[in-house]
């Protein structure tokens, strides 16, 4: 009896061990990458569907009104570009200094082709995906020698965190001016960091030329992305041992600083925030630095309190990255983890500086860029610290086999994260996916589409010079729309009228 019982126990243990081993083998990093990819792209589907409902709004019409009228009367791209330059010059004198962004503002797709606004959210989300992957791929595949899908899973997790809890979906996708002012420079920044790494690896000067062009565009667009790239250049200059080789970074750095100088000193900036407030002072700069560091720390706590699921995904990034890095060719030394983490926090905190220094009310753009930079710098810090630990373990010959780690850590972490998703399911309701699905399912998206079509039938009728529009309901879901109101002198009313060539635009109520 005793032997039979022992045999049965051993058989059960072997079966359980076999099952766990098979499960661990089945849940590979590649399958995790596929699952995360499916989750990310599935979460973006309702947002891309709403792209075909989204319409231009407010400033979208204002900046491109003259370009649209020029196109209608001439159908000449050259004339439209000339008009765009005139609008840019005017706006830099009276309102804002981001000259490159303003020029792109004037070229809104809708200025050329009716119902082409869907291009904005679809193209720029795809551009964000491609640029983020390009940068991560350069590090994970070309520097660490990992497989493409190992960098892919990190990329997808970064994008999933960003888009699902984005502070402003309008800035991220549905407001043309917001997308061009914030997302376009960030896409360029990701590419430029990739170009920088590419140059260091290949010594091909064309990547410096690309970087010069990119920095000119960023310097004329966004302080946030300019800071991000400039901080990256400084970091790489310090890290690279061959200073003569690293000195080539001076070309894109100076190009960006010159472009940024023209943006900062444009008269429109002073007009926008009250003249003397744009003046430089050492005291104000010191206050801005201290306050930016404080605000950065406070908002990290706020992210933790308001979106704990974000930190669950960051934990999963750490788990997956460790397994991938355990087989990486870690030629980089990872000597100073504390300094790296501190520097990354400084880069993140720097995103608060422009709004603090200007001391003026801002749109949802700064909060969106601060959040995105927090994700990027946190992931960077996690990977650096893990690289440092792995280098230490390698030197001491105590590094565990990847198979053991995968079975004992990665696979359980998958299930732990799934359980935590249930625990923090309230955050799922805060996600952009849930918001978009609710907006579509409730019928509000269809109502918005019908209301926009009703207004546009009147606005596109050239025989009508005084347009009386039915008012829209305030339910916009994740979309971004500044409605026409009763007052014909209101900003939105005037710019819509200018875009469509109307003498007056108002509502029937």
Annotate each PLM feature.
Residues 128-140, 188-200, 230-238, 316-321, ...:
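Transmembrane alpha-helical segments
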Residues 3-6, 16-96, 109-152, 243-245, ...:
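Intrinsically disordered, polar/acidic, low-complexity terminal segments
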Residues 119, 123-127, 160-161, 180, ...:
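Hydrophobic alpha-helical transmembrane segments of multi-pass membrane proteins
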Residues 198-217, 247-250:
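Short hydrophobic alpha-helices at membrane interfaces in multi-pass membrane enzymes
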Residues 147-197, 350-383:
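Membrane-interface micro-motifs in multi-pass membrane enzymes
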Residues 321-431:
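Transmembrane helical hairpin unit
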Residues 46-111, 116-118, 176, 223-366:
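Transmembrane catalytic cores of multi-pass membrane glycosyltransferases
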Residues 209-236, 422:
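Transmembrane helices and adjacent periplasmic/lumenal helix-loop junctions
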